[in-house]
A protein has these predicted regions:
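C-terminal long alpha-helix characteristic of the crotonase
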Residues: 2, 9-60, 67, 73, ...
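Interdomain hinge/lid region at the active-site interface
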Residues: 71-75, 81
Length: 93
């Protein structure tokens, strides 16, 4: 399977020319750095755990993470920023 086929199948979100690969990857990393670090860690752990256990186990884990994240200050900040159409300033708490 080549990159274009993987994109059509939904396995990758975007295909870029090799000469722009590092620029695009760094741009994605910078964007992720602007998110709540707590939420990014939870998302990464959810993806890593998706390879372990059953689909139901994964759904239950994601549900627990969702509820845990709802108790954070970053969740409140993110919602307030969204409602007030401003950029969120996360404190990672």
């Amino acid at each position: 399977m080549d990159a274009q086929e993987a994109e059509r199948a939904g396995l990758v979100s975007r295909v870029v020319p090799l000469e722009r690969l590092m620029e695009e990857a760094l741009g994605a990393a910078l964007m992720i750095c602007e998110f709540s670090h707590i939420a990014v860690m939870a998302a990464k752990e959810s993806v890593n755990r998706s390879f372990e256990g059953t689909l139901n186990d994964g759904i239950m884990f994601e549900r627990r993470m969702f509820h845990a994240l709802f108790a954070t200050q970053d969740q409140k900040e993110g919602m307030d920023a969204f409602v007030n159409k401003r950029k969120a300033v996360f404190t990672n708490t």
